[in-house]
Amino acid sequence: MAKSKFLQRPTTPIRVTEKTVAELADAMALTGFQGRKLGESVMTWAEMLRQDNLTIMMGYTGAMSPAGMRKIIACMIQNRMIDCLVSTGANMFHDIFESTGGKHYVGTHCANDEALFKDGVDRIYDVFAVEQEFRGTDYMVMDWAMKNLEAGKSYSSREFFQMLGKHIVENLNADPDGIVASAYRHNVPIFVPALSDSSIGIALMVARRQGHPVNIDQMKDVDEITQIVENTKRTGVIYVGGGVPKNFIQQTEVIMSMLELPIEGHSYAIQYTTDAPHWGGLSGCTFEEAVSWGKIAAVAPKVQVFADATISLPVVSHALREKTMDYIAKRKSPQYDWSGRKLKVRFEAPKAARAKVPARAAPVARKAASAKDAASAKDAASAKNAASAKDAASAKKT
C-alpha cells in the first residue's frame, strides 16, 4: 500500500539531554501544538534576519515591560533583530520608569486590593509598584516636555520618543540599555499611535493644563510609518499581543493601495498571543484572514503562537541569539534619515551606537525626584502664568 501524502514527516519526541536553547527550539519544532509553533517562530524569525532589504517591524502590547520583558526588546533593538517598534504608551512608560531608577516588585494576584490602595501600591496582576514613584516619572516627562517641546507644535510620536530618548541618554543618570534609550542610540524608530492612553499622555495633558500644549499628531505617525514601508522592498512583522500596534502596522499595506502604490503584503508574519480568532477581535485574528485584506502576502510564512508572551519571549530571544549571532552583526538593516521632508532609507550593516553614554551615578530616590520634579514644573508654570499676566496688563494699559 502506497504511503499517504499526508504522512511524510513523523514527530520526534524531545529527549532530555544537555542542549542549547536554540537546539531545544529546533526540537520543539518537530513536536505538536503550540510547542511546535514556538519552534517554528524561531526558525521563521531567523530566516528574516538572513534576508537582504527586509525591514522587521514589531508590535509590542500587553503589560510586558512591568512583567520583566523590557530588556529582551532592548536587546533586539541593539542587535537589530527588529528595525521598527510600535508600542503601547504604557510599555514605554514602564521602561522609562525602570531606566531612571524605578522598580517593579514581585507581588501576588491574591493580594487585598483595598489594602494595596491604602498603602499606595499599584497592582499589575502579580506585579507591584509604588504609585508615588510612578508620579515621579509623570512629573519628569511633564517637566521635560514643558522645557524642551514647543507649545502648540505638532510632533509625531516617533519624534517625541527620539527626543525623549536623547534626554534620557544624555542628561539623566539612566540605564542606557532600556528600550527608549536603546532606540535612540541605535536609530530605531518608536511609534506609539495611542500615546494619550498612558501615563505619558496624562503627563502631557497636565502640561496642557499648565498652559503648554504639546500636540502628538497621529496622522503624522501614519504617514511616517507608511514611508518606511514605501522605502522598503519587503517587510516582516512580529506581534507581541495585538491591539492598536498590530493594526497600525498591518494597515500600512492598505494605505499603500489607496496611494496607488504596489501592494504585496508583508512578507513574513509572527504573532505571540493568548487571544482566539473565533471572538472576532483583531488581537486573535489569523494571518490567513489578513490575506483577504492584502495585509499579509498569500505566500508569506505565517506563524501564530497561542501562548503567554512572558513564556515565549525569553525562549525565543535566547534561541535567536544563539542561532543568529554569527551573522546578525553583518545584517544589512534599514538605516533611517528623517532630516528632510521625506524619509530616506539605506540598507547597510549598522554602525556603533551614535550616542555616548555618560557614566552612571546612583539612581535618585524616586520620592525625592517626584517632589523635585513637581516643584520644578509648578515653578515653570507659575513663571509662565506671571509673564502672561504681565503681558496682558501691559496690553491693557497701552
Regions found by a protein language model. Give the residues of each.
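N-terminal glycine-rich anion-binding loop in soluble enzyme alpha/beta folds
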Residues: 1-42, 46-48
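C-terminal functional extensions of proteins
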Residues: 2-9, 36, 234, 258-360, ...
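Glycine-rich phosphate/diphosphate-binding loops that line cofactor/substrate pockets in enzymes
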Residues: 42-55, 183-184, 227-234
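Glycine-rich anion-binding loop/nest that anchors nucleotide
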Residues: 56-65, 85, 191-195, 213-282
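Short acidic, glycine/serine/threonine-rich loops at helix termini
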Residues: 68-71, 96-102, 201-206, 249-252, ...
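Ligand-binding beta-strand-loop-alpha-helix segment within the catalytic cores
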Residues: 115-200
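Long, intrinsically disordered low-complexity tandem-repeat segments
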Residues: 368-396
